[in-house]
């Protein structure tokens, strides 16, 4: 049985198009066809083919948003349901709501730019682009599927391409970084499988793993706490949460520029999305008790990673720890019981995806010219690479949350949402906000000092001998320009993004607040006994644009 339900479709034809299935299958089928693409030996035809596939995928996701997605609805849209293995409860079920649609668009957008960033790759280009396209389909599937077993399969599918992209095209320690990545991520994925099976078979009868069926089940509080803890570990590795983060600096330290963009731009967001989708939406009673822990872990992420970034002399590792620090705001937003704070967490994921991808692409472009990642060996290249310096400066300012940039809006929404969240006691809110503010202060210090060490001062003798200290080429300017357009656009007018998911966030927060009200004895005195009312509408957050 095949069912389509494209809510909000603008025309009858759009209502019959399986947009999300196409966005998953086009890159996967495109990857399977890569071995059959004729090539003259330099990989040129394969590059253009892969770029075409990623652009088609991006256009499909944009068409899905324009023709079949209605931001004013909070429920599931673009639904597709095909009975697969009914005896085992397996169904091909995909759909999109405010939690997933923005991330689907982000995935297809960044992957198309990563494909363009991979243009200089000359070693085994056929295999490289095969893995890149397979990863694209797997990541879109993570956000689009509506069945927990399918989610697990998609989660595992994208791990294999990342492992091979690290192990084959990475740096000197690529085998170590790739092995550490797969051990952390694949090992923690076992908790997802166990939780999926436990939740699917809960209550007896025919098992069902669809999100709607799981949300309708009345899980006991002890069962919810156990599943929540396991899923928190699995998703905490991918986010990542300190101390489950150590794979990320090693992976970033050895990855190439396009893999950097996919890791920072998309992979980390899978952890944040999964926390909202499963821990908050399907296990609300457990979330009401774990939320203070998420807040504390978020502060640890912000401060610890910012301080560690200070000590890094390797450019890639410095930006990697900066990413971990910024993802701490996602944890605080997810742990808040306010629509504004949770909306800020969602916007922070999108904002960091764009900013992180731009910074890591610039790291790769800089390494191609200087052939070093050590800040001690850099300096004085600003005169020879003025455009590159300008691109670095704008992206660094975006990362330190300059007003008018998307990072400023998202972090301010998290702060404002948590600070005004009456679900927590006032002393707890004051302490958390003050500690998180320390990370905000540290960020411009280590980012601006990094720019000074790269571009200012006296040029090192080792760099003088290089003849390839050329300025940014048009391809590089185009990639950064494409990333800066939404960064600045969201910073100046946040409703460009917040309107696409505000209704879903309100519904999610309302569910969590309802669960908190049913808890008669909170796990800690950090949470008040009485929950506040859910904010009525979150269309345009009251955040200054500049």
UniProtKB/Swiss-Prot annotation:
Broad enzyme group? translocase
GO MF term (any one): NADH dehydrogenase (ubiquinone) activity
Q: Which reaction does it catalyse?
A: a plastoquinone + NADH + (n+1) H(+)(in) = a plastoquinol + NAD(+) + n H(+)(out); a plastoquinone + NADPH + (n+1) H(+)(in) = a plastoquinol + NADP(+) + n H(+)(out)
Q: Which residues cross the membrane?
A: 17-37, 48-68, 103-123, 127-147, 149-169, 181-201, 222-242, 256-276, 290-310, 327-347, 348-368, 389-409, 430-450, 477-497
Could you name the domain of life of the organism this protein comes from?
Answer: Bacteria
Would the keyword NADP turn up in this protein's UniProt record? yes
The principal location of this protein is membrane
Disulfide linkages recorded for this protein, renumbered to the chain, are none
Q: Which GO terms describe its cellular component?
A: plasma membrane-derived thylakoid membrane
Q: How does it sit in the membrane?
A: Multi-pass membrane protein
- EC numbers, comma separated: 7.1.1.-
Q: Name one GO biological process term.
A: ATP synthesis coupled electron transport
Any one Pfam family here would be Proton_antipo_M
InterPro entries, per the entry:
NADH_Q_OxRdtase_chain4, NADH_Q_OxRdtase_chainM/4, NADH_UbQ_OxRdtase, ND/Mrp_TM
Cellular location(s): Cellular thylakoid membrane
Q: Which UniProt keywords apply?
A: Membrane, NAD, NADP, Plastoquinone, Quinone, Thylakoid, Translocase, Transmembrane, Transmembrane helix
| Family designation | Belongs to the complex I subunit 4 family.
| Free-text function comment from the UniProt entry | NDH-1 shuttles electrons from NAD(P)H, via FMN and iron-sulfur (Fe-S) centers, to quinones in the respiratory chain. The immediate electron acceptor for the enzyme in this species is believed to be plastoquinone. Couples the redox reaction to proton translocation (for every two electrons transferred, four hydrogen ions are translocated across the cytoplasmic membrane), and thus conserves the redox energy in a proton gradient.
Write the protein's name: NAD(P)H-quinone oxidoreductase chain 4
Lineage of source species:
Bacteria, Bacillati, Cyanobacteriota, Cyanophyceae, Synechococcales
Q: Which gene encodes it?
A: ndhD
